[in-house]
From Swiss-Prot:
Cell compartments where the protein resides: Secreted; Target cell membrane
Keyword presence, Zinc-finger: no
Residues annotated as signal peptide: 1-23
Role this protein plays: Amphipathic peptide that possesses relatively strong activities against Gram-positive bacteria and a fungus, but has very weak antimicrobial activities against Gram-negative bacteria. Also exhibits mild hemolytic activities against human erythrocytes (16 uM induce 8% of hemolysis).
Propeptide: 40-68
Keywords: Amidation, Antibiotic, Antimicrobial, Cleavage on pair of basic residues, Cytolysis, Fungicide, Hemolysis, Membrane, Secreted, Signal, Target cell membrane, Target membrane
Protein name: Pantinin-2
Source organism per UniProt: Pandinus imperator (Emperor scorpion)
Entry's Gene Ontology cellular component terms: extracellular region; membrane; other organism cell membrane
Keyword Cell membrane: no
Tissues where this protein is expressed: Expressed by the venom gland.
Family recorded in the similarity comment: Belongs to the non-disulfide-bridged peptide (NDBP) superfamily. Short antimicrobial peptide (group 4) family.
Leucine amide: modified positions: L36
């Protein structure tokens, strides 16, 4: 009886680990496939505008307005 209970507990733990790892691997695969797909590669070009290192006078004025 103890052996059957131990096997049941081990089976439940392994099944829980498998179901959680499947969700994690699915999320990782979705992220990788979105980066490598045509749309993912086209969307990466949009991020170039975010890393503009120049701060204009309009940016400074806007920041001053926010900080008031």
């Amino acid at each position: 009886m103890k052996a059957q209970f131990a096997i049941l507990l081990i089976t439940l733990v392994l099944f829980q680990m498998f179901s959680q790892s499947e969700a994690i691997f699915g999320a990782i695969w979705k992220g990788i496939s979105s980066l490598l797909g045509k749309r993912g590669l086209n969307n990466l070009n949009d991020f170039d505008e975010l890393f503009d290192g120049e701060i204009t006078k309009a940016d400074l004025d806007f920041m001053r307005e926010i900080m008031k």
